[in-house]
Amino acid sequence: MQVTETVNESLKREYKIVIPAADIAERSARRLEELKGQMRLPGFRPGKVPMSMLRQRFGKSVLGEVLEKAVQESIREVMTSHELKPATQPDIDLISEVEEGKDVEFTLALEVLPEIGETDFSALALEREVAEVAAEKIEEALETLRQQSKTHEPVTDGRAAAGGDLVVIDFIGKLDGEAFEGGSAEAYDLELGSNSFIPGFEDQLIGATAGEARTVTVSFPEDYPAAHLAGKETVFDVTVKEVKQAVVPELDDDLAKAFGKESAEALREAVKADLQGELDEVSKTKLKRKLLDALADGHDFPVPQTLVDAEFEGIWAQIEKAKTDGQLDEEDAAKSDEDLRADYRKIAERRVRLGLLLADVGQRAQVTVAQEDLNKALMRELRRFPGQEAAVINYYRNNQQAMDNLRAPVFEDKVCAHILALATVTDKPVSVEDLMKDPDEDATPTA
């Protein structure tokens, strides 16, 4: 086999490979000999079929089989001898038609992965924005839990219904004097002020007492899903059967136990921990973004354009869909396709460069994704699809690509955590408002 390097530019490599005709002939002869021993043809004893007949019958198919194997072996040999790490599947092109008795010539073209030097991450300095959950937010969350746990009891003094009360009603809706389908119910629980009914309906029941009949006139919204009712004025005959007042439990140990905690103080601490955890996640996300920005700014090695092309095509498909759906943001909508393509190609190149860098760092640091890590990621996915847990598990179990997609962000997070452990990270106390602010927003002066 003869190998000639014809291109060596940046990450591009191309080789002209020649497999001598004698090598192909020898391989073909060996393969035909194997077939001869296996062949059973009428009129010939086993293993005695003439070679000329074998060549006539199977010569072309054997040549194709031998060529495919010889080409693959030669590619592997070139990859090994030249220590090539292909970024994507190589391109293989025959230089001339394959003919028996002639050398086989073809080109092997590929892009290789870049050599990425080791980085001293101890020289990296980053600020981590941190914020503490405010006491009033804890109280608001506890109040929400109290309201979620409220019950309703019949009023005992015969008073009229007020906002926040629950009325038990029978009603019949009429359009142009005729009852319409879906417009009636009996013993329906309606909380006044919940805005769960047509606008204006609940307001007209405030002041009603148990046993009272009222006529409620409302107009359905113009965008109401049922087209025959949208924008139409409708009359409801309503009978108030019962008025119930809300009973909100105290923040005590009994309420805490309803939420799986032993005491009111334990519930308070759990709520505080949950709220603080949400802020800490925002802090973590913003720190990771700063880290990735710093890594992108600090590394400028060449990247395989085949990978950039693939990444860009994925991004551009999303842009095209956003255009079709009318969901392209104002800034992008104002740009020409040429400018948009240029902008998003830069983003694609950045993503590829960061992906290669993190993969290299992870390999050097022997970062691995354990089954426990994958299980946690899968549990997060399950929480996104309540009631469909079995289907989600089945999907990942039978879809390797989906499992790889689940693994990738876990690996990325672990590599980022490794880098941050080596870097100098300083906590910067900020307000909750500043922590929640998008870093791309213009900074606003603070007093």
From Swiss-Prot:
Keywords noted in UniProt: Cell cycle, Cell division, Chaperone, Cytoplasm, Isomerase, Rotamase
Single Gene Ontology MF annotation: peptidyl-prolyl cis-trans isomerase activity
TM regions (residue ranges): none
Protein name: Trigger factor
Domain notes: Consists of 3 domains; the N-terminus binds the ribosome, the middle domain has PPIase activity, while the C-terminus has intrinsic chaperone activity on its own.
Entry's family note: Belongs to the FKBP-type PPIase family. Tig subfamily.
SUPFAM superfamilies xrefs: FKBP-like, Triger factor/SurA peptide-binding domain-like, Trigger factor ribosome-binding domain
InterPro entries membership: PPIase_dom_sf, PPIase_FKBP_dom, Trig_fac, Trigger_fac_C, Trigger_fac_C_sf, Trigger_fac_ribosome-bd_bac, Trigger_fac_ribosome-bd_sf, Trigger_fact/SurA_dom_sf
UniProt keyword annotation of Cell division present: yes
Organism name: Rhodospirillum rubrum (strain ATCC 11170 / ATH 1.1.1 / DSM 467 / LMG 4362 / NCIMB 8255 / S1)
NCBIfam families for the chain: tig
Principal location class: cytoplasm
Key word Cell membrane present: no
Record domain PPIase FKBP-type: where: 164-249
PROSITE patterns from the UniProt entry: FKBP_PPIASE
Reactions this protein catalyses: [protein]-peptidylproline (omega=180) = [protein]-peptidylproline (omega=0)
